[in-house]
């Protein structure tokens, strides 16, 4: 897996000019996926745009959760290259391939 930068809740709050509680709400509502890294809640930086969470992420995160993926598993799947997509699913989402990513994610449930 390609090395990615991770941001803590305070990092994200500062970057988006919101409170840490608003960042935690984004995580609770699955606009962002977070994982504990060395005991600290962190989010892959690639899940954010300059304006906020990557808009395509939430629906994909909900689909993965409905398919039985825990947050750590969903994050791993999003960040690791996928043979059927040719790139990591998060990179395909950023490139505008939302429907294709979600089809692949949906197939994982079966």
Identify the residue ranges that each predicted region occupies:
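Non-transmembrane "mature" sequence context
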Residues: 1-110
């Amino acid at each position: 897996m390609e090395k990615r930068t991770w941001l803590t809740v305070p990092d994200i709050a500062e970057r988006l000019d919101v409170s840490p509680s608003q960042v935690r709400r984004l995580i609770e509502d699955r606009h962002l996926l977070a994982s504990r890294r060395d005991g600290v809640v962190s989010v892959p930086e690639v899940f954010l745009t300059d304006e906020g969470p990557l808009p395509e992420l939430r629906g994909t995160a909900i689909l993965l959760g409905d398919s039985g993926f825990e947050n750590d598993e969903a994050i791993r799947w999003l960040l690791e290259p996928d043979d059927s997509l040719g790139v990591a699913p998060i990179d395909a989402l950023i490139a505008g391939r939302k429907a294709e990513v979600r089809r692949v994610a949906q197939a994982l449930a079966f």
